[in-house]
Amino acid sequence: MTVNARGPEGRTDGAVPEGAGGMKKLAGISLAALGVVFGDIGTSPLYAIRECFHGDYGIAASNANILGVLSLLFWALILIVSLKYLTFIMRADNEGEGGILALTALIIGQSIKKKKDRWVLVSIGLFGASVLLGEAMITPAISVLSATEGLQIIAPAFADMVIPATVVILAGLFLFQHNGTARLGALFGPIILLWFFCLGTLGIIQIIQYPQILEAVMPWYGINFLLNNQLHGFLVLGAVFLAVTGAEALYADMGHFGRRPIRLTWVLFVLPALLLNYFGQGAFLLASPEASSHPFYALVPSWAMIPMVLLATVATVIASQALITGVYSITQQAMQLGYLPRLTVTHTSASHIGQIYVPAANWALMAATIGLVLGFGSSSRLAAAYGASMTTTMLISTILFFFVARDLWKWRPPVLWALVSLFAVVDLSFFGASMSKLFHGAWFPLAVGLLMFTLMNTWKQGRRLLMRQLQDRTLTVDGFLDSLALQEPQRVPGQAVYLTANPDIVPIALLHNLRHNKVLHSEVALFHFSSERVPRVPNSKKVEFVRLKDGFTQVVARYGFLEYPNIRQVLELANALGLNFKPEAISFFLSREKIVADEKTKILPSRKKMFALMARNALSATAYYGLPSGQVIEIGVQVQI
């Protein structure tokens, strides 16, 4: 999964200089990417093969079926990860950033002009991001659970310890989040490097003994498997797909590590290690089909079982950490794009801006993840839910990619339709197989996606109605300034800043202040923060202001969906351009809206209540914009929607 999961090393554009220094930097970035980007897909060998032969729709571990499953798995990794994501979708970046929301913002901002088309694509992208949140709840649960299940292989008496151990590990992981991962993050890459080395080593030992397993790279083994097993074979695709879960993370983390390090790490190290392990599991099953209930741990010598269970547990925790950080990132993006209310965000690193902590998201994720462990009870039962979330996300990525290639890249229709049709057939096959498990857990990520989509859509629509109501009760800036010339109010010395959602409209707080106090400050600045559909706005383009008449100034501050508006930074940039407002002497005026339901509006009553609840629990503008609380005056406004 994950959209824009942040690692410990800070952002890079992936540009690596030539020479020895460049190669050293490339190696360092690639090692860092191992710990953040590839943790999810790298822990799939714990359960992917097992679910094909031992899951809800597990098939008999005959030689033909083993070769067929491995063939399907091999080509899934090649077509979905290597071809679709690394070759094509990673080209569709939004100023270097990847992920569903970044991709949606790119399409909407640059290519789609019709309002109806924009709404449809925004809804598709928003639902994809919502399903990703459901996946983020499942991934830590299934990953850590699949690792700790090795305890019962060490000794059956440990079986009762699996669930408690998993809950303790997950609870510790979430409770640690507020400390950040700056120090521990340096260990992520080397640990995952060791994990992949062990994967490859365990696999190659078995392949040497049964080299005939390599015949599975031939696609006709997979085709024959589907033809011979028909419906049963199709249903097994849902388990085969588990091998490519985490592919979305390669695209989502592109802005952090760059295309080249991710591609090289995949081709030269990750893909070979995964294939060696999967084929090694297949080779072992050729000789011992009865091991289908635990093929991964069956590869491990008895003397190495305890260290391997510990390493697997640490690897799954690292993979979970990357996804948790990804949830913080997608929450941040949704807030900046106006789909979620303001939430508390803490920066956990003074040197790396991408390292953030969102308490509300953390506690919700913790409750859901531990609830899934307790509710499902095993990684095998969670597998159905996991596959459903990822197939939905990948299908949506294909749809969005189509519009990028058609409208931005102007691809010729024959080439475009041929490629997208290939991706769509693969995606729909896996999606259909995963949906067959709808009542076995696949409903969960879809339910979470629908809930989050409803919340985000409700907030966006509610804010739109709220702004419309406020604009109907105020004046344009030009009209207001003209009215001052007719009836000049008393002016008092000082500087005042009013925050406004629309730079051309007078803030309601200003009108209420003037109506009740009958005075205006001698210098008044109307500050508007504009969220752009790009990841970041350079400082040179972040702030601009216009001097109006009668001591008024209009200030517009632009920031990207990966940035946070900060009043001190904006004032510094504006003062450098000649604004001359003293931060310590400014009075900041804000309006605080009280939402009241109005039967005349078309929005459903339940959604009105939902919006009002979200508005009441949103972080205050004072905290969100970093305003000095001792200089803030809030004016209450009642608004009907």
UniProtKB/Swiss-Prot annotation:
Its main location: membrane. The keyword DNA-binding does not apply. It catalyses: K(+)(in) + H(+)(in) = K(+)(out) + H(+)(out). The chain crosses the membrane at residues 29-49, 66-86, 119-139, 156-176, 185-205, 231-251, 266-286, 298-318, 356-376, 384-404, 415-435, 438-458. It holds the Pfam family K_trans. It is found in: Cell inner membrane. It comes from the Bacteria. The keyword Zinc does not apply. Keywords: Cell inner membrane, Cell membrane, Ion transport, Membrane, Potassium, Potassium transport, Symport, Transmembrane, Transmembrane helix, Transport. It is a multi-pass membrane protein. InterPro entries: K+_transporter, K_trans_C, K_trans_N, Kup. Signal peptide: none annotated. GO terms for molecular function: potassium ion transmembrane transporter activity; symporter activity. GO terms for cellular component: plasma membrane. Transport of potassium into the cell. Likely operates as a K(+):H(+) symporter. PANTHER family: LOW AFFINITY POTASSIUM TRANSPORT SYSTEM PROTEIN KUP, OSMOTIC STRESS POTASSIUM TRANSPORTER. Belongs to the HAK/KUP transporter (TC 2.A.72) family. This is Probable potassium transport system protein Kup. It comes from Chlorobium phaeovibrioides (strain DSM 265 / 1930) (Prosthecochloris vibrioformis (strain DSM 265)).
